[in-house]
């Protein structure tokens, strides 16, 4: 049975030409469109812009979700994912049976298309060889160019800190509609009320538009070249709900990944531009989660 039957929703799943995320755990053939040469296709047949999909909300399933969680974590951490023991992190997520939510479209035994959970970083930080300690060191190192956030990372996640910080992990396939997110956060709010967190730290991603080396090799004129020497690329959210979270955050900021990504050159995204992904952290007081959820429900109503 679904985790919250009342939360089951039908939404149009947006189709996308950008195959940005790794969906290797899915059967590619089952998602491949018919070939234009297929004689069964009519000449005037059009591919629909949206497809109605029933989304169901479930608890994490130890027997089914392990590999899909690993894939989604790799998407979230991008090119730096190889720096962490994602098997340990996946196991940690699955062990929290009463905390966190997955979204599936084909019943409990199918792979999740989205996950949301929180991990008590303060509980695991003293295990110096563990994945949480590695993430803490990573966050401290990557935020050195973000002084206020860096200061809070050292203060709240340091060895002598008594603050209880929950790491919120949220990731989904790129064509999942944002309207599925508020119910997940509402359930997380209910599930964490008795855990007495002081702060939540959201691990996410943003991106900027970056000119690709392929364009440079082709010597094509680029819009970016017309911006002038003082041009600073605009930052965009992968997850629209992050804008709501950021409004309530005490500190936040984007940071460059340690390992360079080839995503922009391989995808030729936005035609003349590539996508330059970067990590993003948002820190907010736990008491503000209720207000965040309330605004999400308004901003992203079904």
Curated annotation (Swiss-Prot):
Q: Which gene encodes it?
A: BCP1
Xref: PANTHER family: BRCA2 AND CDKN1A INTERACTING PROTEIN (PTHR13261), BRCA2 AND CDKN1A-INTERACTING PROTEIN (PTHR13261:SF0)
Biased composition (Basic and acidic residues) is annotated at 1-13
What does this protein's UniProt record list under function?
Involved in nuclear export, actin cytoskeleton organization and vesicular transport.
> Is Lyase found in the keyword set?
no
Keyword entries, A-Z: Cytoplasm, Nucleus, Protein transport, Transport
| Keyword check for Nucleus | yes
Q: Name one GO cellular component term.
A: cytoplasm
Please identify the protein, giving its name as recorded. Answer: Protein BCP1
Q: Where is the composition biased (Acidic residues)?
A: 16-46
According to its UniProt entry, the protein's GO biological process terms are: protein transport
One Pfam family matching this protein:
BCCIP
Q: Which InterPro entries match?
A: BCP1_family
Family recorded in the similarity comment: Belongs to the BCP1 family.
* Region (Disordered) location: 1-46, 211-232
Locations listed in the record: Cytoplasm; Nucleus
């Amino acid at each position: 049975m679904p985790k919250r039957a009342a939360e089951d929703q039908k939404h149009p799943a947006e189709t996308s030409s950008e195959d940005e995320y790794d969906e290797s755990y899915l059967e590619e053939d089952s998602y491949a469109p018919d070939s234009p040469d297929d004689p069964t296709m009519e000449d005037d047949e059009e591919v629909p812009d949206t497809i109605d999909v029933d989304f169901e909300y479930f608890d994490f399933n130890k027997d089914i979700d392990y590999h899909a969680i690993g894939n989604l974590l790799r998407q979230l951490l991008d090119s730096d994912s190889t720096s962490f023991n994602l098997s340990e992190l996946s196991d940690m997520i699955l062990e929290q049976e009463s905390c966190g939510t997955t979204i599936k479209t084909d019943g409990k035994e199918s792979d999740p298309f989205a996950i949301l959970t929180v991990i008590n970083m303060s509980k695991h930080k003293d295990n110096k060889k563990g994945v949480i300690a590695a993430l803490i060191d990573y966050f401290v190192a990557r935020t050195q160019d973000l002084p206020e956030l860096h200061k809070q990372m050292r203060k709240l996640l340091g060895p002598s800190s008594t603050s209880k910080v929950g790491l919120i992990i949220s990731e989904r396939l790129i064509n999942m509609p944002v309207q599925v997110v508020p119910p997940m956060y509402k359930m997380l709010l209910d599930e964490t009320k008795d855990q007495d967190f002081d702060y939540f730290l959201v691990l996410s991603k943003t991106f900027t538009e970056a000119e690709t080396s392929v364009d440079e090799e082709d010597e094509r004129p680029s819009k970016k070249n017309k911006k002038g020497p003082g041009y600073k690329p605009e930052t965009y959210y992968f997850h629209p709900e992050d804008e709501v979270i950021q409004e309530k955050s005490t500190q936040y900021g984007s940071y460059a990944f340690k390992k360079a990504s080839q995503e922009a050159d391989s995808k030729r995204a936005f035609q003349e531009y590539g996508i330059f992904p970067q990590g993003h952290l948002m820190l907010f007081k736990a008491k503000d989660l209720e207000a965040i959820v309330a605004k999400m429900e308004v901003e992203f109503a079904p």
